[in-house]
Swiss-Prot record:
GO MF annotation list: large ribosomal subunit rRNA binding; structural constituent of ribosome
The organism of origin for this protein: Pseudomonas fluorescens (strain ATCC BAA-477 / NRRL B-23932 / Pf-5)
Protein family per UniProt: Belongs to the universal ribosomal protein uL10 family.
This protein's record includes keyword Ribonucleoprotein: yes
Short name of one Pfam family: Ribosomal_L10
GO annotation terms (biological process): translation
GO cellular component terms, A-Z: large ribosomal subunit
Function, in words: Forms part of the ribosomal stalk, playing a central role in the interaction of the ribosome with GTP-bound translation factors.
Subunit structure: Part of the ribosomal stalk of the 50S ribosomal subunit. The N-terminus interacts with L11 and the large rRNA to form the base of the stalk. The C-terminus forms an elongated spine to which L12 dimers bind in a sequential fashion forming a multimeric L10(L12)X complex.
Protein name in the entry: Large ribosomal subunit protein uL10
Annotated keywords: Ribonucleoprotein, Ribosomal protein, RNA-binding, rRNA-binding
């Protein structure tokens, strides 16, 4: 079915805005995935702040032109499902990776992060990035461990001086 020129321009503009605001992008082939499964994927993506859209390849190439995601042009072959992470760089990769475990026909093609192309086998790097809260928790545990070690050392020195004075 042919799409009107105005509709094509609107799609390109919408995807371009999503690309400009995104932290990372993941491209997949969803051929053979049921409508119910895709609906669940879209719902999960929406909740995680991920923009998901099926777009024609020619429109997608125009939409990402001039953005950090034009490195993905070679991955725009066949039916293309693209996801842009708006809040966390690894969100789209994590969602697609989890979804692919239950759907054997769902194939992740590639990803892009900070203008760098990541092949499908490298997507684990992006998916394993800690969320902001996880990173803060790790940092706080490191800081807390260092301060408690310092406090124990100071207490040991104090105890040694008290023992020597007694």
């Amino acid at each position: 079915m042919a799409i009107k020129l105005e509709d094509k321009k609107a799609i390109v503009a919408e995807v371009n805005e999503a690309a400009k605001a995104a932290l990372s992008a993941v491209v997949a082939d969803a051929r053979g995935v049921t409508v119910g499964a895709m609906t669940g994927l879209r719902k999960e993506a929406r909740e995680a702040g991920v923009y998901v859209r099926v777009v024609r390849n020619t429109l997608l190439k125009r939409a990402v032109e001039g953005t950090q995601y034009d490195v993905l042009n070679d991955a725009f072959v066949g039916p293309t499902l693209i996801a842009f992470s708006k809040e966390h760089p690894g969100a789209a990769a994590r969602i697609f990776k989890e979804f692919a475990k239950g759907q054997e026909k769902f194939e992740i093609k590639a990803a892009a992060f900070e203008g760098k192309y990541l092949a499908a086998n490298e997507i684990d790097v992006l998916a394993s990035l800690p969320t902001r809260d996880e990173a803060i928790a790790k940092l706080m545990s490191v800081i807390q461990g260092a301060t408690s070690k310092l406090a124990r050392t100071l207490a040991a020195i104090r105890d040694q001086k008290e023992a020597a004075a007694a």
